[in-house]
Each structure stands twice: as C-alpha cells, then as structure tokens.
C-alpha cells in the first residue's frame, strides 16, 4: 500500500478483492539501519526507508523483483453532467455504429485523487504476461507499451505474471498503462486514492493463479461450447447462407461451436 503521506484508507471497499474473512498470517518485522524487513515463511519484503525502494525476495534470500519508489501526483476528478438542462443529443455514425453524443455537458470537479506510477526493474531475460485481453497479439510485454482500457474486444485486467514465478495484482479500476522501454518500466494508474497492490509469489504459474483466485474469488466457468471455435462475420444475408457455413465446417472436419450474427444483422439503432 502506497499513500501520499496522508491517512491510509484501509477501510475503502474494493471492487476487485473478494469480501470475506481472511486468516491472519504469521510474519516478522525488523528495522535495521536504513531498511525495514518484513518476512513470512515464503516471502520477504525489504524496504529502503530512505529511497522507498522495495526488494521482493524468496525465503532463501534470492531476489524475485525490485520495485523503485512509486510516484503519486495530485489530480482533479472531473464528472460531466448537464446540470438542470435537458440533454442535447446528437446521433453520430462512427466506425462502431451509431453513437449518442451529449452536446451540453459541463465539467464539475468532485474530489481530488492521484495519478500513480509503480516502477519495476525486471531481470534481463524475464518475461511479463497477462494484463487481460487486447487486440495486438502481444504475448510477452517486455519492450512494449500497452494501454489498458475497456472497449469492445479490449478487456484489460490489472494483473501480470512473470516467468520468474510471481504475479502482481493492482487494486485499481481506472485506466492504466504498462510501459517497458530503455528509459523506464512502470505501471501508470490514471486515478487512484492510493496505490494498493498484491505480490503473489509462487514456483509455478498455477500457484500464482491460485493466489489470484483466492483474492478475487472463484470465477464461474463458461459452458464447454464457448471454448471452441466461434465463427463471426459482420453479416449473413440469409438463413441458407448461415447454414451452409455450418455444413462446410462439418464437411472439412473443423470443429465449430458457435456462429455469430454480428452487428450488420441487428436492427439499426437498437444496439450499443
């Protein structure tokens, strides 16, 4: 948990972490010259009191990850509304179909929050995976910049996993950016009251996902057909055409579990 020097908001509700009774964890803490060391049976965090850097270590003292001092920059949180006016709506055609745009929105400051940055130092051959579903086809995010925002087929998740055997779950529901280049490696958080993240240490990816599920709750599995091949096209013009698609896949022996009648099939103006 990282704050700006003000009061820690321990009681704030999380939209990510499951609300349940968590058992107490045995740990030890000691303060040496210039550092505080917190240990459990599996993980050790060494905090530099002067710089704010954190080194995450295995129980045997070998290093997992180095985190440099984070940044918190104060920012205004702005909401937009029409006040007492009736909304003036313009219907505009976009590449994603027709959209409603309200023309008479007014900006209103509702509170002050922070923009945050978590800086990390990865090992040279370390790979970083996760961050949800994107459209660029990036497997290993090392050397890449990835904007994490919700849109259509973009489904970001504030969690990453490393081939070094750990994961980072950031308790953040705002826009985020992952960046790794020659200058800096960081996670940018657009709007937070404080930075809360969970270090999930393990020996295998399964152990990391176990910890992730423990913190966020059990996810319901989709029906089996949803894991097969899904055929989607902007428009099928007739039922005959759609059925011929299915017959063709059956003929060539390619499993097909779902055919999507996409947006050009739907009634104009009745979808978002």
What is each of the regions a protein language model found here?
Residues 222-226, 252-257:
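Loop/turn elements at helix/coil->beta-strand transitions in domains of secreted/extracellular proteins
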Residues 229-232, 270-272:
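A short, structure-level motif marking secondary-structure boundaries and short turns
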Residues 261-272:
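Acidic/aromatic-lined carbohydrate-recognition and catalytic surfaces
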Residues 1-225, 231-241, 245-247, 261:
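N-terminal accessory segment at the very beginning of proteins
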């Amino acid at each position: 948990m990282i704050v700006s020097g003000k009061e820690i908001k321990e009681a704030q509700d999380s939209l990510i972490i499951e609300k349940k009774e968590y058992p107490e964890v045995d740990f030890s803490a000691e303060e040496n010259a210039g550092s505080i060391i917190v240990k459990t049976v599996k993980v050790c965090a060494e905090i530099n009191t002067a710089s704010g850097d954190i080194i995450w270590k295995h129980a045997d003292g070998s290093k997992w990850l180095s985190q440099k001092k984070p940044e918190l920059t104060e920012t205004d949180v702005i909401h937009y509304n029409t006040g007492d006016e009736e909304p003036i709506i313009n219907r505009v055609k976009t590449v994603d179909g027709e959209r409603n745009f309200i023309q008479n929105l007014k900006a209103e400051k509702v509170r002050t929050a922070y923009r945050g940055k978590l800086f990390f130092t990865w090992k040279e051959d370390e790979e970083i995976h996760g961050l949800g579903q994107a459209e660029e086809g990036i497997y290993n995010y090392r050397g890449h910049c990835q904007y994490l925002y919700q849109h259509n087929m973009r489904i970001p998740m504030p969690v990453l996993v490393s081939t070094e055997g750990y994961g980072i779950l950031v308790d953040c529901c705002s826009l985020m950016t992952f960046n790794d280049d020659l200058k800096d490696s960081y996670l940018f958080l657009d709007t937070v009251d404080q930075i809360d993240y969970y270090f999930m240490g393990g020996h295998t990816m399964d152990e990391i996902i176990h910890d992730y599920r423990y913190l966020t709750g059990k996810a319901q599995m989709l029906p089996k057909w949803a894991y097969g091949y899904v055929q989607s096209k902007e428009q099928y013009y007739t039922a005959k055409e759609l059925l011929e698609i299915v017959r063709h896949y059956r003929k060539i022996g390619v499993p097909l579990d779902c055919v999507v009648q996409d947006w050009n099939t739907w009634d104009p103006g009745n979808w978002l």
